[in-house]
A protein has these predicted regions:
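Cytosolic juxtamembrane helix at the C-terminal end of the final transmembrane segment
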Residues: 150-165
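N-terminal membrane-targeting/pre-transmembrane regions
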Residues: 1-39, 52-117
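Alpha-helical transmembrane segments and their membrane-interface junctions
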Residues: 110-135
C-alpha cells in the first residue's frame, strides 16, 4: 500500500501540522521563498567554512546543497503546473497524468546528494577522528539503506495518476501503487507533511499520497476524487471518447484558485498562446 513507503524528501523537512487543501496550495509559494533564502544564506557560510576548516565545510556543504535542490525543485514545479493540462492524456487504460522527467530527477536528487557527500564522510570517518566525519559516515549508511528500501521492488515511475470508470490508481515515484474503486467513495480535505490524506469508505485510517513535487494542486485532486466518487454519469464518460475532456473539465481551476497566491494551471487563453 502507498502509506507503507516514506517520501523521498526527508520527513523532518515537512510540517506535521494538518492543514486544508487551500492552505497547502498557497503554502507552496512560501516554501519556495524559505528554501531560496536558505540557499542564498548558505553560500557565505560555506565560504567561511572552507576558509576556516575543510572538514567543517564538508559537514555544511550537504545542507547548502539541500536548500538549493528544494528551491530549484519548487521553481520548476511552478512552471510545470502552469502547463498542467498538457500532462494529462488519454490511453487505452484510462486518463493518465505523467510527471515530467525533470521533476523525477529533482525528486531523486536529495538521495544523490546524501549518498555522495555521506560517502566522503564515511571515508573521513575511517581516516580521522573528526566528529563531522563520523556523523556523515552514519548518514551514508542510513541513506544507502533508505535508497535500497525505496527502489528494491521497482524503478521510478512517471505515471502518477490513472483515472478510469472503475476507480483511480495512485502511484508513487518508487513505482508502488494503490487502486481505489469509486465505490469506496474516496475523498480528501486535508494535507499533512506534504501528503494528501485520502479517506475511503470502510477504512478507519487515512491513505497518504505525496504531493510535494506532483504538478497538480491539492484542490484539483480533491475535486477529482469528490466528483467521480459521487457522479455516476461522469464516471460513465470516462469509458468513452470524451474521457480526457471530462477529466480536464473537472480539474479546471476555479476563479478563487486563479486569483489567490496558489500555483495552478495558466488561464486557457494564456496556455493557448493568447494574451
Amino acid at each position: 500500500m502507498l502509506e507503507e513507503y516514506e517520501l523521498i524528501w526527508p520527513s523532518w523537512l515537512r510540517s506535521r501540522r494538518i492543514g486544508t487543501c487551500a492552505e497547502a496550495d498557497r503554502g507552496r509559494r512560501k516554501n519556495t521563498m524559505i528554501f531560496s533564502g536558505g540557499a542564498a544564506l548558505s553560500s557565505p557560510l560555506l565560504l567561511l567554512a572552507v576558509l576556516e576548516d575543510p572538514v567543517i565545510f564538508l559537514a555544511y556543504l550537504p545542507l547548502g546543497g539541500m536548500f538549493t535542490i528544494y528551491a530549484v525543485s519548487l521553481i520548476r514545479l511552478r512552471h510545470y503546473m502552469r502547463a498542467g493540462r498538457s500532462l494529462w492524456s488519454a490511453t487505452e487504460s484510462g486518463v493518465v497524468m505523467e510527471v515530467p522527467r525533470e521533476l523525477m530527477i529533482l525528486d531523486l536528487a536529495p538521495w544523490v546528494l546524501y549518498l555522495s557527500f555521506a560517502f566522503s564522510g564515511a571515508f573521513e570517518m575511517i581516516c580521522s577522528d573528526y566528529l563531522p566525519g563520523s556523523f556523515l559516515g552514519v548518514a551514508f549508511v542510513l541513506s544507502s539503506v533508505g535508497a535500497v528500501r525505496c527502489f528494491w521492488r521497482s524503478l521510478p515511475a512517471r505515471e502518477r495518476i490513472l483515472v478510469t470508470g472503475e476507480g483511480v490508481r495512485l502511484t508513487r515515484i518508487t513505482g508502488q501503487s494503490s487502486f481505489i474503486p469509486w465505490s469506496q467513495k474516496p475523498s480528501a480535505s486535508h494535507v499533512n507533511g506534504g501528503d494528501l490524506l485520502i479517506n475511503t469508505k470502510g477504512r478507519v485510517d487515512e491513505m497518504r499520497f505525496p504531493m510535494s513535487l506532483l504538478p497538480v494542486s491539492c484542490r484539483q485532486f480533491q475535486r477529482l476524487l469528490d466528483t467521480f466518487s459521487r457522479s455516476v454519469s461522469k464516471r460513465h464518460r470516462l469509458d468513452g471518447p470524451y474521457a480526457l475532456r471530462t477529466v480536464l473539465d473537472v480539474l479546471e481551476p476555479t476563479e478563487e484558485e486563479y486569483s489567490d497566491s496558489s500555483w495552478t494551471w495558466a488561464r486557457p487563453e494564456v496556455s493557448q498562446g493568447g494574451a
